[in-house]
Design a protein with these regions (language model features):
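GIY-YIG nuclease signature motif recognition
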Residues: 53
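Short coil-to-beta transition motif at edge beta-strands of beta-rich domains
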Residues: 31-40
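Contiguous surface segments at macromolecular interaction interfaces
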Residues: 1-5, 10-29, 47-50, 58-194
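Compact alpha/beta protein-protein interaction domains typified by the UBC
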Residues: 42-45
Length: 194
């Protein structure tokens, strides 16, 4: 099956939970209605394309909330997402990083009409950019998630909440000693505990 190929923007401070395979879903106000291959762009101050995420078919949060009792954490978290306008949960299946992230300036040299979207854009409309991105050296896949069930302990959890977990702190300490650390220049939402 050929997946739709998109260019997906992220704020850098929200990236670490994805990198550490803690965040299982991306939440968006609007999104494609099919599985996608997303070239991942970290916005200012990074302004680089850092790799590829494989994303599953999104599901509507307003439909899934009905499966949970009103007194549960997952019900509360889903409603908080809905109140912020985040209608879709997009399963994050895998992440693969470029060995050398690509500045948006390089992309604009290849295609001067290219613009960074607020959410996403169809990369198939920018064939030269897509060809360039496809030819980059990559690390092995960081993780692979099979979404044959809903990860309820993770569903609609904020990145801020994820950063406070013991799992995040453990993986963050491991990553700080990893050679890839200097490649991914993203920060934190919370002040990092030592």
């Amino acid at each position: 099956m050929n997946k739709r190929i998109i260019f997906l923007s992220f704020r850098p401070k929200f990236f670490r939970p994805i990198l550490y395979d803690i965040k299982k879903y991306e939440y968006r106000k609007r999104f494609c209605d099919e599985p996608t291959t997303a070239y991942l762009y970290l916005s200012s101050p990074i302004r680089k394309v850092i790799g590829i995420m494989e994303l599953g078919k999104p599901f509507r949060m307003d439909e899934i909330v009905q499966n949970y009792d009103k007194d549960t954490d997952v019900y509360r978290r889903i409603n908080e997402c809905l109140n912020c306008g985040e209608k879709f949960a997009v399963p994050i299946e895998s992440l693969q990083l470029f060995k050398k992230p690509i500045s948006i300036n390089v992309i604009k040299e290849i295609e001067p009409k290219f613009f960074v979207p607020r959410c996403y854009l169809n990369l198939e409309n920018y064939r030269n950019v897509l060809s360039y991105l496809k030819n980059q050296d990559m690390y092995d896949i960081e993780f692979f998630n099979i979404h044959d069930k809903i990860y309820e302990d993770n569903l609609a959890m904020t990145c801020r909440e994820m950063e406070l977990t013991d799992e995040f702190l453990k993986k963050d300490n491991e990553y700080l000693n990893n050679s890839k650390y200097d490649i991914v220049e993203c920060g934190y939402i919370n002040v990092r505990r030592k």
